[in-house]
């Protein structure tokens, strides 16, 4: 009798395991070797790519019938080099157009599945939309979204930021028409989940540094900020821009001194801007919440307060493996500039700052962080 019960329990366990396996969410990232192979597959299946391939048929006939090969050669070279560019542009516009026509369905999926700012919450939304777009002949493959992060980014650039930047009802209706009530409901659900995440983050998931008294800011280790910056260029993300800068130095060797100085100065300025942008791009939503929480809870005022915030965040980002060392911020001044430039400044943004995020879901907490710094100064 006991053996039968054990067998039944095992069979139930196997069935439940199989049910869980069948319910497992499958996204293109699980099927393709990489995002590049997925991208190539999407291009291959696109109408623009097929048209580009068909263009070679009349060109081949022209080559065979023409007595003068110069004109066929010129056209062939144009098709060869400009064709792929047009294919990429058309495919990008086609994706944007296809998604913009399905905003209501996008909103329904968000309302039903209640995702937060955590990318994992968007897996169900991405999988459902992939199936819906393919089954309703909106898209020609089952793999519109490569993974949850791509779906979340599409939500940010298609719904969250454009809708939030519209200040009045008339502007929203003009841009989004019948989708407005669905978007409002979806954003309401999303903001509610983000608020839950923020409250949970500040209580159960709160982080406190250990041994921070031994931590030093880069300003204490480097004589000049330029030295610190040049060391940061060794980061793999900045390798290509830095090599490009060296190439510009070589190319500009024939210019007069004034033009060369202005040209190289502008290139170096763009390199610095690129480095600053990379810092905010590598921060996840959790990192940003920790940054704002650290600012709000810091008791020190003025420059000392920002130094403490910089020291804590340097340790935090290093422990979370978001940065390779404890030198994310040079000092408190750099930390304050980072907050004002990438967080507080976006509150008055009137248009998208792509590729930089507007962090719309963090606007209430950004205001709170700014207010907390002002109150500390007053005290």
Swiss-Prot record:
This is Protein COS3. Disulfide bonds: none annotated. Its main location: membrane. GO terms for biological process: intracellular sodium ion homeostasis; protein transport to vacuole involved in ubiquitin-dependent protein catabolic process via the multivesicular body sorting pathway. GO terms for cellular component: endosome; fungal-type vacuole; plasma membrane. It is found in: Membrane. The chain crosses the membrane at residues 73-93, 255-275. Residues 1-72, 276-379 are cytoplasmic. It is a multi-pass membrane protein. Pfam families: DUP (PF00674). Belongs to the DUP/COS family. It comes from the Eukaryota. Residues 94-254 are extracellular. Keywords: Membrane, Transmembrane, Transmembrane helix.
């Amino acid at each position: 009798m006991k053996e039968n019960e054990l067998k039944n329990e095992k069979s139930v366990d196997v069935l439940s395991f199989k049910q869980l396996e069948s319910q497992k969410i499958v996204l293109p990232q699980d099927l393709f070797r990489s995002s590049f192979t997925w991208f190539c597959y999407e291009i291959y299946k696109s109408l623009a790519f097929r048209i580009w391939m068909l263009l070679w048929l009349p060109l081949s006939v022209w080559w065979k019938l023409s007595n003068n090969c110069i004109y066929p050669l010129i056209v062939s070279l144009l098709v060869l080099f400009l064709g792929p560019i047009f294919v990429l542009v058309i495919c990008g516009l086609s994706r944007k157009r296809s998604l913009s026509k399905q905003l209501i369905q996008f909103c329904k999926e968000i309302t039903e599945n209640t995702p937060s700012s955590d990318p994992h919450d968007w897996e169900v939304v991405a999988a459902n939309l992939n199936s819906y777009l393919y089954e309703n002949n909106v898209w020609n493959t089952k793999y519109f979204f490569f993974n949850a992060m791509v779906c979340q980014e599409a939500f940010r650039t298609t719904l969250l930021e454009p809708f939030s930047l519209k200040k009045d009802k008339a502007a929203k209706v003009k841009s989004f028409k019948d989708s407005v009530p669905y978007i409002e409901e979806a954003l309401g659900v999303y903001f509610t989940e983000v608020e839950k995440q923020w409250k949970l983050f500040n209580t159960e998931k709160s982080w406190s540094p250990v041994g921070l008294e031994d931590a030093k800011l880069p300003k204490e280790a480097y004589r000049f900020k330029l030295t610190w910056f040049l060391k940061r260029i060794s980061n793999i993300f900045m390798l290509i821009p830095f090599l490009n800068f060296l190439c510009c130095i070589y190319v500009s060797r024939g210019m007069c001194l004034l033009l060369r100085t202005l040209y190289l100065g502008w290139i170096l300025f763009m390199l610095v801007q690129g480095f600053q942008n990379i810092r905010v791009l590598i921060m996840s939503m959790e990192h940003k919440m920790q940054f704002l929480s650290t600012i709000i809870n810091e008791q020190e005022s003025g420059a000392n307060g920002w130094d403490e915030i910089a020291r804590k965040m340097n340790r935090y980002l290093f422990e979370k493996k978001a940065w390779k060392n404890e030198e994310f911020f040079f000092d408190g001044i750099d930390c304050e500039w980072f907050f004002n430039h990438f967080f507080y400044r976006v509150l008055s943004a009137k248009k998208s700052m792509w590729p930089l995020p507007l962090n719309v879901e963090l606007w209430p907490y950004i205001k709170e962080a700014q207010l907390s710094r002002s109150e500390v100064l007053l005290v």
